[in-house]
């Protein structure tokens, strides 16, 4: 059994026991949260597709980690003008462990 869920403006395919990184969600490590934006649910030959989401379907996940990704460097330069701008960015993320999928 697996499901397609939407969180943080992106869609993820999840199954029980999976661990994935999503955009930062509020909560502490160990907290449980429900992902209710379930777009599709597949259980063997039984396929349910929402329009756009499935009613009464949810995915229960546990927050495994709150962290920040690797630093990326943004560097801008104008030739011959002496203009240089260096900027760094680290995106915050939440690591989730999928515990249960229910319909």
Swiss-Prot record:
GO terms under cellular component: cytoplasm; ribonucleoprotein complex; ribosome
One GO-annotated biological process of the protein: translation
Keyword ATP-binding among record annotations: no
Family matches, as InterPro entries: bL21-like, bL21-like_sf, Ribosomal_bL21, Ribosomal_bL21_CS
One Pfam family hit: Ribosomal_L21p
UniProt KW keywords: Ribonucleoprotein, Ribosomal protein, RNA-binding, rRNA-binding
Sample GO molecular function, one term: rRNA binding
Family listed: Belongs to the bacterial ribosomal protein bL21 family.
SUBUNIT field: Part of the 50S ribosomal subunit. Contacts protein L20.
Primary role: This protein binds to 23S rRNA in the presence of protein L20.
Protein name (database record): Large ribosomal subunit protein bL21
Organism name: Desulfotalea psychrophila (strain LSv54 / DSM 12343)
């Amino acid at each position: 059994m697996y499901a397609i869920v939407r969180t943080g403006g992106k869609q993820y395919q999840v199954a029980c026991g999976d661990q994935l990184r999503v955009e930062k969600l509020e909560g502490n490590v160990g907290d449980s949260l429900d992902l209710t934006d379930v777009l599709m649910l597949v259980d063997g030959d039984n396929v349910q597709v929402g329009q756009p989401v499935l009613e009464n379907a949810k995915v229960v996940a546990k927050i495994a980690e709150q962290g920040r990704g690797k630093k990326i460097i943004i560097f801008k330069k104008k030739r011959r003008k002496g203009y240089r701008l260096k900027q760094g960015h680290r995106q915050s993320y939440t690591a989730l462990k999928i515990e249960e999928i229910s319909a």
